[in-house]
């Protein structure tokens, strides 16, 4: 019976491959970065357009669809149970494209078996895969015990207000998985702490300081405009100098990456901060602020701020500074930390305030606790067993620093579609980075995994 099912799924995937890629390209072509709220578009015109198009694609597959007051939507297959339902949830909003692209970020390209474009991995490719999982079940005429909803989020990258709205106005699923991380199964996510380091109005040497495109990404570019003579400045690695007006524009060139996985990145804001300090391009108030910010950038483990810690399930705390800006004469540096169970948001805030002293003010603090679900629960076992059978691996669940929709639901995990051992091609980049890339064969394999997992979840007594 299992072999016959495998053959049916393989035939379905092969027959639909080209259309799957076309549908992903359609969603990628929509710039769905969060924008200013509009009438009927609480998260901006781009996310609303992506939501509408996704529901249109689902309807074209014969799935029932619903737009939940423009905050979120879903495609659905009916089931016998009128009270309980299963769900998947993906998102069709994306982070800003940022710098460094060699391709148009909103025109999907295919090269050597890889898709390239903003959202191919996070999370438009997986969104399309979940729709096709429901399409398979519909075409096969499977009688479902529990209805299945493929939820379509459009505010994941910033605030997740979409899922907050949904859970406040609609019943929660008995189990939900989100294809927005790595395989096999992530059954725990670190806590999330964010805030801003704000300077006083310094009226000093630094006239402008900008860097980064998202608070959740390590910036690869940053620059400061300072009132000085370029002939007095020295060269430094990853720093360029150019005259601008009556001063000098100092640019830092780093390497971008996701805030939850900062290993191997180079923060361009930190490069500029160090250059300003090393060359005394600041007055006393600016120096005090930059010294505070330097403590943030000195270590992605939080050593400089005195917040470093680690535990067994989650490993070490991470922290990055994603964006720098000048607002009303004040420098503003954002922070994004993913923390394990050995600390909490209040403790982190207290430790940071101690570390920065009077040089900066910590503002706009927010935090969310870690969450963890035991790996031996029936739904998680169904997911992990399916993954191992399809791939031939003997993988076990893991925890991570990334934050997904899963933490918002009573019983949920993230489930693929990426792989921790995936090696990006020279022309490809990571989620949130330039030239975001995803392998076609692995996404199609994920589609097979999702179909079988949903069938197994249907058999569980929730």
Identify what each model region corresponds to:
Residues 2-118, 142-144:
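Acidic/His- and Gly-rich active-site-bordering loop/insert found
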Residues 12, 385-386, 390-460:
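Zn-dependent metallopeptidase/amidohydrolase metal-coordination segment
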Residues 83-152, 158, 170-171, 428-442:
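Active-site metal-coordination/substrate-binding segment of hydrolases
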Residues 92-94, 148-159, 179-184, 213, ...:
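Acidic, glycine-rich active-site loops and adjacent beta-strand->loop/helix elements
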Residues 95-110, 192-193, 198-199, 242-252, ...:
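Acidic-glycine-rich active-site phosphate/pyrophosphate-binding loop
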Residues 125-136, 270-274, 445-452:
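Short amphipathic alpha-helical face segments that pack within enzyme cores
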Residues 157, 164-341:
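Midchain, well-structured core segments that form catalytic/ion-binding scaffolds
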């Amino acid at each position: 019976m299992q072999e016959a099912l495998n053959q049916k799924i393989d035939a379905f995937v092969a027959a639909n491959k080209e259309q799957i890629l076309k549908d992903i390209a359609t969603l990628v072509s929509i710039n769905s970065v969060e924008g200013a709220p509009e009438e009927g578009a609480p998260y901006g015109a781009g996310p609303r357009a992506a939501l509408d198009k996704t529901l249109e694609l689902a309807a074209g597959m014969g799935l029932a669809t619903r737009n939940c007051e423009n905050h979120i939507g879903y495609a659905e297959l009916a089931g016998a149970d009128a009270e309980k339902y299963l769900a998947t949830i993906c998102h069709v909003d994306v982070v800003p494209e940022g710098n460094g692209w060699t391709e148009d970020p909103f025109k999907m390209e295919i090269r050597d078996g890889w898709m390239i474009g903003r959202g191919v991995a996070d999370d438009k490719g997986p969104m399309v895969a979940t729709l096709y999982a429901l399409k398979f079940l519909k075409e096969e005429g499977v009688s479902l015990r529990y209805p299945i909803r493929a939820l379509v989020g459009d505010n994941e990258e910033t605030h997740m207000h979409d899922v907050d709205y949904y859970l406040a106005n609609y019943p929660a699923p008995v189990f939900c998985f989100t294809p927005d991380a790595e395989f096999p199964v992530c059954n725990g996510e670190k806590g999330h702490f964010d805030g801003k380091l704000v300077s006083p109005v310094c009226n000093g040497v630094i006239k402008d300081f900008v860097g980064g495109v998202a608070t959740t990404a390590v910036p690869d570019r940053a620059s400061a405009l300072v009132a000085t003579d370029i002939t007095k400045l020295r060269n430094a690695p990853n720093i360029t100098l150019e005259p601008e007006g009556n001063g000098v524009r100092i640019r830092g060139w780093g390497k971008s990456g996701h805030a939850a996985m900062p290993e191997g990145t180079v923060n361009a804001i930190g490069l500029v901060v160090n250059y300003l300090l090393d060359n005394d391009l600041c007055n006393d108030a600016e120096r005090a602020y930059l010294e505070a910010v330097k403590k943030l950038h000195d270590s992605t483990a939080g050593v400089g701020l005195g917040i470093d810690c680690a535990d067994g399930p989650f490993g070490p705390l991470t922290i990055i500074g994603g964006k720098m800006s000048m607002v009303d004469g004040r420098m503003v540096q954002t922070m994004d930390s993913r923390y394990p169970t050995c600390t909490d948001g209040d403790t982190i805030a207290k430790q940071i305030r101690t570390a920065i002293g009077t040089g900066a003010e910590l503002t706009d603090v927010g935090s969310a606790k870690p969450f963890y679900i035991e790996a031996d629960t029936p739904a998680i076992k169904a997911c992990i067993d399916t993954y191992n059978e399809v791939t031939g691996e003997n993988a076990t669940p893991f925890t991570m620093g990334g934050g997904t929709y899963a933490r918002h639901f009573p019983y949920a995990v993230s489930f693929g579609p990426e792989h921790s051992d995936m090696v990006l091609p020279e022309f490809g980049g990571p989620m949130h980075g330039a030239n975001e890339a995803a392998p076609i064969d692995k996404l199609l394999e994920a589609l097979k995994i999702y179909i079988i997992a949903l069938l197994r979840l249907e058999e569980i007594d929730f």
